[in-house]
Amino acid sequence: ETFSHVFGETLRQLAREDRRVCAITAAMADGTGLTGFAREFPRRFFDVGIAEGHGVAMAGGMAKQGLIPVFAVYDSFLQRGYDMLVQDMALEKLHVVLAVDRCGIVGADGETHHGCLDYLSQIPGMTVLSPASFAELRQMLRRAVLEMDGPVAVRYPRGGEDGYEGDCGDESVTVLRQGTDAAIVTYGILTQQALRAAELLEKEGISARVVKLNRVAPLDSSGICRALDGVKRIVAAEDQLRAGAVGERLGALLLELGAGTEKLVLRSVGTTLPSQGSTVELRHALGLDAEGIAQAVREVLA
């Protein structure tokens, strides 16, 4: 089972519950998990072809007419519609749901498909949710479609779960593991790697707290401060390019709030787009596997 499959099945259930729910794809019905939706709801399924910008603009128009459009699209392809994301969706605060597949390092799909630019977090009024498990994808998509207002993006990776199967509920920030020496702040598919890193460090006598962000934009300042209370040394781990991503925004937030953070180490994709390679290979090369994150904690404590 994959995140794409779980998305498609969940959206079909939501469409059964609310006739306003519609699905949009840009020539990627199979890849995004929408083939079942298209068969069950042919009049509520729209394929705009290889025209992601048009898909966003069309979703905005549908939202203005009272529908609930869900645009399922690969992260790297949605970049083409950035102007429409701002002008035809965010500017008017329209309730469009973006189901953003292939976020982060994608491995087998190749270097053109990496979703490592955190561009959605820069759009005013955009809420960005980041599930780390199938259960979280189900509940986050349900909330995004039926309970939330304005533009919402649910970002999830290629493939299946990485070992973490929890469900954060509607919390924006969750402490998954207590610790006193340092904190690892992460989100999405890297959650399990962070938990494994904390286990490795425990064997060395290092107590690492693991803080999971479920909503990566806007950041929940009060929730983050509560989660990091008492810890002064922090590692932020994410499979995104560093510029404008969670790590940089977290650092600015903690500084602005005077949280007393003594040292922050950012573990990210860095400043260069990832090359070809498997997910395991690329995580290891970038220091985003369990051992790499553990090493970042050692550095922040040095």
Task: List PLM regions with ranges.
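Thiamine diphosphate
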Residues: 1-10, 16-39, 47, 53-56, ...
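Glycine-rich phosphate/pyrophosphate-binding loops
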Residues: 65-77, 96
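Histidine-anchored nucleotide/phosphate-binding helix
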Residues: 60-61, 84-86
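Glycine-enriched alpha-helix->loop->beta-strand junction motifs that scaffold or abut catalytic
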Residues: 41-43, 63
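Small-aliphatic-rich amphipathic alpha-helix that forms the alpha element of a beta-alpha
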Residues: 51-65
